[in-house]
Every structure is written in structure tokens, then in C-alpha cells.
Design a protein with these regions (language model features):
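N-terminal secretory signal peptides that target proteins for export/translocation
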Residues: 1-11
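Residue-level detector of transmembrane insertion/anchoring sites
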Residues: 4, 18-19, 175
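Bacterial N-terminal signal peptides
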Residues: 18-26
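Sec/Tat signal peptide C-region and signal peptidase I cleavage site
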Residues: 29-33
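Subset of outer-membrane beta-barrel
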Residues: 34-278
Length: 278
């Protein structure tokens, strides 16, 4: 199973474009009505997990991600970040659009987020992030009946429900060290579909840590770790290490305990970055 990514970006105040192609596994059961897609390329779109980890200061960015297992299980994710100077400080605002197809369910979200920067010392800063999300969940009850799926609580027509969510994050950036913690949908998400069915999406807690060893003009090694926990997904984690040459060519590996060992590579050509993960 492979993954490809491409990145295009400009430093300072220009806009960039990030995209990635990923293959993910989703549940086959229609009662698993509401879940979050697992974005394996978390280092490409860290803002998906942490609203404080937006684009670097002075940088704008547009990101697009798409993943698919088959025609019944897929997602796409669009993110955008823009720098903002407010009250004498430099901050970041952004938005996110997610559409997650899960067999007979469609989960769409629209989020607005902001990240306030607190300078600590030269080369170090702390970012505080907040995100508000509108969730929209749709169930195709008519198609479920055609496929022989019955549940007395589920509607027999195409129905939808809406709910709101709140997420918080904290991200530290140093000269070499980067670390962050976040909670997605702090109070959980309770969505009512039809007259008798209610689905719940519990909070998700996540953390990341990375460290830059070496020089940007020669060889560099970047070890990183990501982990998350929620009541429905339990513990998930990934450890990865990436070796960079002149900040242009990268080769690394990743390991997800109990799941898989992967390899990834990346090539930067000016402002364009191409990558592949398997």
C-alpha cells in the first residue's frame, strides 16, 4: 500500500499548495456511523490534528489531501492558512473542509481556526490554537434497505443531522525541537439522525514531537513521533525518522505498532516537493 504527496509553497507571505494521496482502511459496518479519517501524512497537514500547528509565521498555505480504499470508502480534505497581524502580534487564521464517505454514511465538516503566537525567546515561540467545527452527517436509508440492511432505529430515507464541535491545541516551535498537544471536539459530538438514532463522536487527544539533528545545508536527520487516543479508536501511534540531504532529498521509514512498517521519500525542486510513502 503506497502513498504519494506533492507540495508547492512559497516562503513569507505567498500562498502554497500541498497535496497528498493516501490509501486508508475504514470500517465496513454502517452502524460505525461517525468517525474521523486517519490521515497518515500528519507531517504534511499537522493542522488537521492540532489547530495551533498552522503554517509558519509569515507564510500562507493551501493544502489538499485525498484518500480512498474503494468507491465506498474515501475522503478529501482542504485546508488553508493565512498570516494575520493583530494587536501588535503576528498570528495565523485558517479554515478546513472535510468530506468523509463511509459506506452508507457521509460525514462533512467545516472548520474555522485561529492560532495566536507568543514569542518566548529568539528562535522559540508558543502557539495557542482554537477551532470551531460544524458537523453534518448523512445516512442513506433507502440504499440500506436495497442492500438488505435493517435497523429499527435508523431512518429508511436519506436523512441528515448537524452538530457543533470545539477543538483546542498548543504547539511549541524551537530552533530544533517541535512539540504539540491537542484535543479535537473537546465536548464530543452528538448527532441525531431521524427520530430515533443518535450517534456520538468522542473527543480525540493527540500529541506530536520532532527534533532536527544536523544542518539544512548538509545532512540532517529528523526523528518524529505521533500519537492519539479516543474511546472509539483507542491508542494509535507512529514513529518515523527522515534523513535529509541539503534539505532537498529525503529518505525515511515509519512504524505503526501492531500495524505496518513503511518507507517514504521526498524530493524538493525549488518550491515544489514530491513525495511517496509505502
Amino acid at each position: 500500500m503506497g502513498k504519494t504527496t506533492f507540495t508547492y509553497g512559497r516562503r513569507r507571505r505567498d500562498l502554497g499548495l500541498v497535496g497528498c494521496l493516501a490509501l486508508l482502511l475504514f470500517s465496513e459496518q454502517p452502524v460505525a456511523s461517525q468517525s474521523r479519517p486517519l490521515v497518515r501524512q500528519w507531517d504534511e497537514a499537522l493542522g488537521y490534528y492540532n489547530p495551533a500547528a498552522l503554517a509558519p509565521l509569515g507564510t500562507g498555505q493551501i493544502a489538499g489531501l485525498w484518500g480512498r480504499e474503494d468507491h465506498r470508502h474515501s475522503y478529501y480534505l482542504l485546508l488553508t492558512y493565512l498570516p494575520l497581524e493583530l494587536l501588535g502580534g503576528r498570528h495565523v487564521v485558517g479554515a478546513q473542509l472535510l468530506h468523509h464517505q463511509q459506506d452508507l454514511w457521509e460525514h462533512s465538516t467545516f472548520s474555522l481556526r485561529g492560532s495566536a503566537c507568543l514569542p518566548l525567546s529568539e528562535g522559540k515561540r508558543l502557539q495557542l490554537g482554537m477551532e470551531g467545527t460544524l458537523h453534518r452527517l448523512t445516512f442513506d436509508g433507502k440504499k440500506a434497505l436495497e442492500e438488505g440492511i435493517t435497523n429499527s432505529e435508523l431512518p429508511t430515507t436519506k436523512s441528515e443531522g448537524k452538530a457543533l464541535g470545539l477543538s483546542l491545541g498548543l504547539q511549541f516551535y524551537g530552533e530544533r525541537l517541535s512539540a504539540g498537544i491537542a484535543v479535537t471536539d473537546l465536548f464530543g459530538v452528538h448527532t441525531r439522525i431521524g427520530e430515533r438514532y443518535t450517534t456520538q463522536l468522542p473527543p480525540r487527544y493527540s500529541a506530536t514531537l520532532s527534533y532536527h539533528i544536523g544542518s539544512a545545508v548538509a545532512w540532517a536527520f529528523v526523528p518524529a513521533i505521533w500519537g492519539s487516543y479516543s474511546q472509539d479508536e483507542r491508542w494509535r501511534s507512529e514513529v518515523r525518522g527522515t534523513l535529509w540531504y541539503h534539505a532537498r532529498i529525503a529518505l525515511g521509514s515509519s512504524y505503526r505498532p501492531g500495524e505496518a512498517l513503511g518507507l517514504h521519500t521526498r524530493l524538493r525542486l525549488g518550491e515544489l516537493s514530491l513525495g511517496y510513502q509505502v
